A protein has these predicted regions:
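Short polar/acidic secondary-structure junctions
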Residues: 22-23, 48, 114, 207, ...
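Short, polar loop motifs at secondary-structure junctions
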Residues: 16-23, 173-177, 195-197
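Phosphate-binding loop of NTP-binding sites
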Residues: 32, 38-173, 177-186, 217
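Adenine nucleotide phosphate-binding catalytic loops in nucleotide-utilizing enzymes
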Residues: 28, 148-149, 184-227
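A short acidic, often aromatic-flanked loop/helix-cap motif at beta-alpha or helix-coil junctions
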Residues: 24, 36-40, 90, 196-201
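N-terminal leader/targeting and accessory segments in enzymes
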Residues: 1-42
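Intrinsic-disorder/low-complexity, polar/charged segments
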Residues: 20, 35, 90, 175, ...
Length: 227
């Protein structure tokens, strides 16, 4: 990316950050740092810490992007919501998502992906979520994690962060892996959902009414989602 710094300035950027001194010129708008990626993440965390609003972190083996879109859509009916665009969910996409949050935002929904152990730990320390949701933990894409246990440990880094910071998780109690992961981490505040023994109940669908319905505190919410 260093080689494109001058091109970016010529196209109107106010400043360009580089981490290779050989690209420096007398141009006063070039800023030299030790590591551009680290600087991006540090700037993103600083910006996030200026925002006293709820941050929802979402990860999981499958369904991250769909879940993020659904959560953001529902919340936007009442709040000004900023959320990850597309699947910008990695070590570059998450900081860019945070840096694009405007001061009038009321809730942020941040998708976080992982392909290796430690990825989620890195991202939560940038995004600083106070709410979290793991959609599931599966055996897809095992190559980067080494084993299913590696997947659970990596996704569980979101729970680890929320445990350490007294955060809240939205927990599918019908998923035994997720249930145990939360149960093994005392101090997390879970809000449960599922088809039984939960605070938010997913109601059965029928052939003549195949749309997803949920029950919250005695109130039934009808959706246009096919269950």
């Amino acid at each position: 990316g260093n080689k494109f710094a001058m091109q970016a300035l010529e196209k109107g950027c106010a400043y360009a950050v580089v981490d290779d001194s050989s690209f420096l010129t007398p141009h006063s708008s070039l800023i030299l740092v030790d590591n551009v990626l680290d600087t991006l993440q540090q700037l993103a965390r600083y910006h996030r810490e200026q925002l006293d609003i709820p941050f929802v972190g979402i990860t999981g083996t499958n369904g991250k992007t769909t879940t993020k879109e659904l959560v953001a859509t529902v919340l936007s009916k009442k709040y000004r919501v900023h959320y990850t665009q597309g699947n910008f969910n990695n070590h570059i996409g998450v900081p860019l998502t945070l840096l694009s949050i405007k001061p009038d935002c009321e809730i942020a929904v941040v998708e976080m992906g992982a392909s290796h152990p430690g990825d989620i730990e890195e991202l939560v320390n940038v995004a600083v979520p106070n709410f979290g949701l793991i959609t599931n933990v599966g055996k897809a894409h095992l190559q980067g994690f080494g084993s299913f246990e590696g997947v659970k440990k990596t996704k569980g880094e979101l729970y680890d962060y929320l445990q350490e910071h007294s955060g809240t998780v939205f927990l599918n109690v019908d998923n035994p892996d997720l249930f145990k992961m939360v149960d093994d981490r005392p101090g997390i505040n879970p809000i449960t959902y599922g088809v039984k023994h939960q605070e938010v109940e997913v109601l059965p669908v029928t052939a003549h009414d195949p749309y997803l319905r949920i029950k919250i505190g005695g109130v039934v919410v009808n959706t246009h989602l096919v269950g």
